[in-house]
Every structure is written in structure tokens, then in C-alpha cells.
């Protein structure tokens, strides 16, 4: 199977294993006012420091189940994914991510203007950890545009296995031409879908409406 090669590729393949486990520090989600109402807490100026486990090769001793079903984690997403492994390894049914498109757009919270090699090195360890979180019948859905979409497809073939590729869903993002387009005005982006184990993958089917059923003349 063809694979991508880029500067620091060998290093990128070891990043997910070398990222240290960090304990998640639980904070209060709501603060109660004197009147009895609940309000969101103030956003801290910087993420709270997490305790660094001395031996990153081994998972820390953590509760068998998180205190809450819903988690909102503030911090580097690579470290956050590693911190979730002891809780959710092999248990997640569906993952959706919207990574940086690497299109020279201005974003406040991450660099959206990386060189191709840097972008691939950023994506690889995160995809590796995401695969570990998936159940055998789980799937991952990734939105991307033409700028890195084809490189991402080959990279995900390597991480998830080409045989586990489900589809490239093309979705329309614009309904009219852009006046500032240099050559052609693109109107679509992509969503790459992979299963961890495609033979076990099942999607829930939507029920047919009466209006849709009325279009069929022959009974099933």
C-alpha cells in the first residue's frame, strides 16, 4: 500500500506513545448564586496545571469510570486524548473531528498555516490515539478541504487500514460563486469516514416518511 513520506515522519510515529499521561483535574461546572440560580463559572486565564505521571509508559491509577458522562476538557488536544485512554480505550462508538484545514486562515486558538510536513506530523499522533479510543464497530468522521484532503486520505489509510475506508462524503459549503476567487470558486468540502473494523460497522437507518413511501407504487 502506498504511504506518505515527509520530514520527521519517523519522529511523528512515536509521538503518541511518548505523550505523558496527565490526570484530569475536575472543576465545578456551575456556580450557584444567592438567588438559587446556576451560572457558568468564569473562564480561567490559563488551563489548570495537571499532575504529571512519572512513568508515561504506564497508565496512571484512575477510577474505572468517570464521575460524569459528559466531559469538557481544556488543554492541548493531544494530551487530552492520551488522558482519555484509561477511561475510554476501545469504547467510543463515533468520533467527529474538524481539524485545522491548513489554509492560511486566521484562527485564534491554533495555527492554521502550517507547512505540509508539520501538518501531517500534527495529525498523525492524534489519529493514532483516536483509533485506540474507537470500539471495533466504531467509526471516525473527519471534515477537511481540498488543501490537505488527499494527503489526509492516504494518511488515514495507513492509520486505520485502507480496507476500513467507508466513504468520502462531499458536502456543499457555498451556494454561489465567490467574487474574490482567483481561478475557480470551490463550493464543497469533504468528510472522510473510516471504521475501526469495517465488517462490524453498522449505521442506523432512518425510517421512511409517509411522503417518501407514497412515491413507490409496488409494495415490498
Stretches found by the model and what they are:
Residues 116-170:
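Conserved Class I SAM-dependent methyltransferase catalytic core
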Residues 84, 105-110, 152-154, 168, ...:
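Short, solvent-exposed loop/turn and secondary-structure capping segments
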Residues 72, 96, 141-143, 170, ...:
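Structured core elements
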Residues 1-96, 103-117, 122-125:
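DnaQ-like (DEDDh/DEDDy) 3′-5′ exonuclease domain used for proofreading
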Residues 86-89, 154-162, 185-186:
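Short, surface-exposed basic-aromatic patches at helix termini and helix-loop junctions that form
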